[in-house]
């Protein structure tokens, strides 16, 4: 007994399995598509947040704004070191004068 599906090359068992599994496959395909859509939305949201954080970081931590202040602090530190050395030298001389008198 030859079936119409056998003539087309599809075995009846194969057709039965497909009919049983096809609804699950359709649901799985739909779920995968929904996941892809939500993934795309999440990527867009993450990019928006990343760009916002980059902009905020640039505004808060603009290194050009602080370069002059850092340079001034470094200059003050160097001056302080020189003054400290001079003070030590003067203290040493003073102690020599007091001990020799």
UniProtKB/Swiss-Prot annotation:
Cysteine pairs bridged by disulfides in the record: none
Coiled-coil residues: 62-100
Keyword Transferase in annotation: no
Entry's Gene Ontology BP terms: endosome organization; regulation of protein localization
Main location: other
Keywords per UniProt: Coiled coil, Endosome, Transport
Domain of life: Eukaryota
GO terms under cellular component: BLOC-1 complex; endosome
Locations listed in the record: Endosome
Function: Component of the biogenesis of lysosome-related organelles complex-1 (BLOC-1), a complex involved in endosomal cargo sorting.
Entry similarity comment: Belongs to the SNAPIN family.
Subunit comment: Component of the biogenesis of lysosome-related organelles complex-1 (BLOC-1).
Protein name as it appears in the record: Biogenesis of lysosome-related organelles complex 1 subunit SNN1
Chain's gene name: SNN1
């Amino acid at each position: 007994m030859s079936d119409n599906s056998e003539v087309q090359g599809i075995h009846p068992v194969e057709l039965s399995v497909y009919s049983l599994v096809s609804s699950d496959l359709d649901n799985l395909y739909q779920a995968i598509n929904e996941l892809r859509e939500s993934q795309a939305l999440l990527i867009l949201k993450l990019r928006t947040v990343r760009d916002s954080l980059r902009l905020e970081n640039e505004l808060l931590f603009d290194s050009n704004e602080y370069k002059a202040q850092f340079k001034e602090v470094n200059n003050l530190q160097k001056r302080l070191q020189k003054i400290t050395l001079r003070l030590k030298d003067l203290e040493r001389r003073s102690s020599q004068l007091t001990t020799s008198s």
